Amino acid sequence: MPDVYGPGASQNDPIPAHAPRQQVLPEEYQRASDDELHRRIREAKDTLGDKVVILGHFYQRDEVIQHADFVGDSFQLARAAKTRPEAEAIVFCGVHFMAETADLLSTDEQSVILPNLAAGCSMADMADLDSVEDCWEQLTSIYGDDTLIPVTYMNSSAALKGFVGEHGGIVCTSSNARSVLEWAFERGQRVLFFPDQHLGRNTAKAMGIGIDQMPLWNPNKPLGGNTVSELENAKVLLWHGFCSVHKRFTVEQINKARAEYPDVHVIVHPESPMPVVDAADSSGSTDFIVKAIQAAPAGSTFAIGTEINLVQRLAAQYPQHTIFCLDPVICPCSTMYRIHPGYLAWALEELVAGNVINQISVSESVAAPARVALERMLSVVPAAPVTPSSSKDA
């Protein structure tokens, strides 16, 4: 039985064979107390000074976030690293595809480090290059000269970003997906969207595209499990991928929140299933959720459909509001949770000793077209800035 990503929503998502594996954390870090680990992290940071920058994703545990120089979403953080050209090492407290993106945007003189190589992303691993290339061949054999534009979500491997770059496509984030799809439809008749079906479906529906024009592509079936006529009728072809955390949210949870808190404002991430997004008051990226709470009048009540670490941090930072997670069962991103303070201390102390461990490096043959896809996205909608942060500014 293969190892699994973690508890809760992730329990049925086996780690694909190609996902990275992490060596055992040295025993001294396993045995160290929390206080000792935090002391060692601080001391290593002080020793390294400007030679290192630590990036912390919104979904990281607080014990890690407190040491981050920047806190934000994956693309904000990758771009934030560019503001520290003097940093020889970029330590990305996130997951594998995020570190890859940081490597794409960093200089040749900088090393990108992922403290725990086992911090992958089940959704990103649901679309691999071989399967996407096979899908592409099947679709282009049907569509002929009709232009098909590939769009990959930021939550994908560098190899897939390179694929879309080579095929006239583009990368999107959860905050700019609509603008990116509009860009794609200015250039082609159809879009192949991967790996997250829910973000693609929710975005296309908001643009007025019918559900019958959004067939799901299952890479394990001929023609993705569709008929030729269904594919010919398609406008957006959705890859059979999903986020293990966000698929947990349900309309029943929203109804329960409204029954208990009549004035509640329900915000969900667009990686949630379509019925959940439809039933919510608003949906948006992690940055959207943070800003909505920051701007709300005191005494507001929010039920939030996203990862629990972010929700709990917001509840602690904004005690003037009532903030809770839609899912009553704790729903962490279990792979993000693999970045334990012990791994961060280990990575930093190895840097102090002159050793670079767990380096994430994208080959130039992949990086060059992947950068093209990212640059196309930036030409459509520039990335929102992220400011330097203490642990408070997540």
Swiss-Prot record:
**UniProt cross-references to SUPFAM superfamilies, sorted A to Z:** NadA-like
Which is an annotated GO molecular function term of this record?
A: 4 iron, 4 sulfur cluster binding
Q: Does the keyword Iron-sulfur apply?
A: yes
* One Gene Ontology cellular component annotation held by this UniProt entry: cytosol
- Keyword annotations: 4Fe-4S, Cytoplasm, Iron, Iron-sulfur, Metal-binding, Pyridine nucleotide biosynthesis, Transferase
Q: Which reaction does it catalyse?
A: iminosuccinate + dihydroxyacetone phosphate = quinolinate + phosphate + 2 H2O + H(+)
What pathway does the UniProt record associate with this protein? Cofactor biosynthesis; NAD(+) biosynthesis; quinolinate from iminoaspartate: step 1/1
Query: Could you say which enzyme class this protein belongs to?
Result: transferase
Q: Which InterPro entries match?
A: NadA, NadA_sf, Quinolinate_synth_A_type3
Cofactor dependence: [4Fe-4S] cluster
Q: Binding of [4Fe-4S] cluster: at which residues?
A: C121, C243, C333
Which domain of life does this protein belong to?
Answer: Bacteria
Q: What does this protein do?
A: Catalyzes the condensation of iminoaspartate with dihydroxyacetone phosphate to form quinolinate.
Q: Which PANTHER family match?
A: QUINOLINATE SYNTHASE, CHLOROPLASTIC, QUINOLINATE SYNTHETASE A
Family membership noted in the UniProt record: Belongs to the quinolinate synthase family. Type 3 subfamily.
- The name under which this protein is listed is Quinolinate synthase
What species is this protein from? Corynebacterium glutamicum (strain ATCC 13032 / DSM 20300 / JCM 1318 / BCRC 11384 / CCUG 27702 / LMG 3730 / NBRC 12168 / NCIMB 10025 / NRRL B-2784 / 534)
Instruction: Provide the organism lineage as a comma list.
Output: Bacteria, Bacillati, Actinomycetota, Actinomycetes, Mycobacteriales
| Gene giving rise to this polypeptide | nadA
